[in-house]
């Protein structure tokens, strides 16, 4: 079975590496163009490109997978199936109809819930207790195709984005092998999604990162952990836009929203609209991430200061 893999970030790269190491015949790779990344804005290859080069798999990086160059590449490698994971761009009808066995996407949510670009962040932000991975046959509508395989996992109350993503990557790797083995022998039963139950996980915008301490402690906790460790939830402290990481506890006792009540080696207790949260780390502009205790000792922060939420960002 000839496989073309389509994906871009680390999530996709780990799945591709797993397929190749397990002997699957990946005949081609499509990934996004290299882009400037990090603080120095240095142009770096996508993680999927790195894996393709390592294993000498032919690859392309088109601006659009639906244009002539990409279609010619796909036809030249002749895939039986196309596997997509976190590619970041829409596949058109010509691509979807090209492989004889179809195109399948590995999506980190329990479809039809959380269709879209940011399912892991949104399930955490909304305080969901369960999530999972869905492999489905792609159709023109976003994340709306019939389901081939789905697995569910529970979410720890204080689990961060990084932690949950790692577990979903491992689950995706296991499921990709199971799915392709079944596809190889024609043992796939597709189940239509219940579109009436669909919810959406839109792309993250900068304003989504801002912590509103006037909300209850549970909501504040969920906001911070949804973007921990990247790109980091934001709040304003004086004139600084800072990042917050590592909520380790919540408390029902009241306090003023945003008020830094107490700092020790374990973190800072910060007031919310209902209750308090204990946050472990903070990052000031141009500085490394540090504990609140380090920030206090460095005279960057003291008890009695207040975090604010601003709309002018």
Curated annotation (Swiss-Prot):
Enzyme class: transferase
Cellular component GO terms held in the UniProt record: cytosol
Keyword Transferase attributed: yes
Binding site residues for (6S)-5,6,7,8-tetrahydrofolate: 109-112
The entry's keywords: Protein biosynthesis, Transferase
Catalysed reactions, semicolon-separated: L-methionyl-tRNA(fMet) + (6R)-10-formyltetrahydrofolate = N-formyl-L-methionyl-tRNA(fMet) + (6S)-5,6,7,8-tetrahydrofolate + H(+)
GO MF annotation list: methionyl-tRNA formyltransferase activity
EC number: 2.1.2.9
InterPro entries from the UniProt entry: Fmt, Formyl_trans_C, Formyl_transf_N, Formyl_transf_N_sf, Formyl_transferase-like_C_sf, Met-tRNA-FMT_C, Met-tRNA-FMT_N
Keyword Repressor on entry: no
Described function: Attaches a formyl group to the free amino group of methionyl-tRNA(fMet). The formyl group appears to play a dual role in the initiator identity of N-formylmethionyl-tRNA by promoting its recognition by IF2 and preventing the misappropriation of this tRNA by the elongation apparatus.
Similarity field: Belongs to the Fmt family.
HAMAP family: Formyl_trans
Protein name, entry field: Methionyl-tRNA formyltransferase
Gene transcribed to yield this protein: fmt
């Amino acid at each position: 079975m000839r496989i073309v893999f389509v994906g871009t970030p680390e999530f996709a790269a780990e799945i591709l590496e797993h397929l190749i190491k397990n002997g699957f015949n990946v005949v081609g790779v499509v990934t996004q163009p290299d882009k400037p990344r990090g603080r120095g804005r240095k142009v770096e290859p996508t993680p999927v490109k790195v894996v393709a080069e390592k294993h000498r798999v032919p690859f392309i990086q088109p601006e659009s997978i639906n244009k002539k160059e990409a279609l010619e590449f796909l036809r030249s490698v002749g895939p039986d199936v196309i596997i997509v994971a976190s590619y970041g761009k829409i596949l058109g009808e010509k691509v979807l109809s090209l492989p004889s066995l179809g195109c399948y996407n590995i999506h980190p949510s329990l479809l039809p819930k959380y269709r879209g670009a940011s399912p892991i962040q949104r399930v955490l932000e909304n305080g969901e207790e369960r999530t999972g991975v869905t492999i489905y046959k792609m159709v023109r509508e976003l994340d709306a195709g019939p389901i081939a395989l789905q697995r569910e996992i529970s979410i720890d109350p204080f689990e961060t984005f990084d932690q949950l993503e790692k577990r979903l990557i491992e689950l995706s790797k296991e499921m990709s092998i199971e799915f392709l083995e079944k596809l190889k022998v024609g043992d796939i039963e597709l189940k239509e999604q219940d579109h009436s139950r669909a919810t959406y996980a839109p792309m993250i915008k900068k304003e989504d990162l801002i912590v509103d301490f006037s909300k209850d402690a549970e909501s504040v906790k969920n906001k911070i952990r949804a973007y921990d460790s990247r790109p980091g939830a934001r709040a304003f402290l004086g004139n600084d836009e800072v990042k917050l990481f590592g909520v380790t506890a919540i408390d029902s006792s009241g306090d003023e929203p945003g008020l830094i009540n107490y700092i020790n080696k374990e973190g800072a207790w910060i007031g919310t609209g209902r209750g308090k949260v204990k946050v472990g780390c903070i990052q000031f502009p141009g500085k490394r991430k540090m504990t609140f205790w380090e920030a206090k000792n460095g005279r960057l922060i003291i008890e009695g200061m207040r975090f604010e939420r601003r709309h002018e960002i």
